[in-house]
């Protein structure tokens, strides 16, 4: 975003109009923030300011929990959404760093393995190629609850949805089917995957 450190560079590059957002609206003193930005533009010299808060990594969880996904989509220029992935449990929100899983349709071995290595706060993101056989259910969900995993997102199928809803566990999937596949063990963990058309890498923020 544009602030007092970058506005001068915009003017130097030839901009006659500079649109500033959060550097003013999120500043503790909006009037002072505006004055500093105008000064930077007039002098064409960047001015370091502490009026605009930059969040540290450890603070991002709380920030993302307060911001809606539509607002995040707007900030990302309408990119990054997972198309066709729907909430299994309504009224819950999930935020966390991704553990990624690529598996074959119906093969739930790697998703279960991902639960074993997940840390509190993680979200497990599974690329099951949109398959019709379930790769996730109640038992994996219970394990996540016990390990304080924040949620699961599946480009594929989930089952045991009544039990998962009773647990209020944040689960998102493309399809629901009571029939599970077989644990053949194919696939990989913590690689770049595609989920709902979006590229997801290990440790990406999932909201």
Positions of predicted regions on the chain:
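Generic hydrophobic/aromatic pocket-lining and core-packing "Φ" positions
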Residues: 7-8, 34, 140-141, 203
């Amino acid at each position: 975003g544009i602030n007092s450190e970058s506005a001068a560079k915009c003017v130097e590059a030839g901009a006659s109009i500079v649109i500033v957002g959060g550097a003013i609206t999120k500043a503790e003193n909006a009037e002072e923030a505006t004055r500093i930005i105008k000064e930077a533009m007039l002098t064409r010299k960047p001015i370091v300011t502490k009026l605009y808060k930059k969040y540290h990594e450890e603070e991002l969880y709380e920030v993302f929990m307060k911001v809606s996904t539509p607002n995040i989509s707007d900030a990302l220029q309408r990119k990054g959404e997972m198309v066709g992935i729907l909430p299994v449990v309504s009224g819950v929100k999930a935020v966390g760093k991704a553990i990624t899983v690529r598996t074959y349709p119906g093969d739930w071995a790697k998703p279960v393995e991902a639960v074993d290595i997940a840390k509190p706060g993680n979200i497990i993101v599974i690329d099951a190629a949109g398959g019709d056989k379930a790769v996730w259910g109640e038992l994996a969900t219970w394990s996540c609850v016990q390990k304080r995993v924040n949620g699961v997102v599946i480009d594929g199928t989930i089952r045991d949805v009544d039990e998962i809803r009773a647990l209020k566990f944040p689960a998102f999937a493309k399809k629901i089917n009571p029939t599970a596949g077989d644990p053949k063990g194919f696939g990989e963990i913590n690689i770049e995957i595609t989920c709902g058309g979006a590229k997801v890498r290990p440790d990406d923020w999932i909201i």
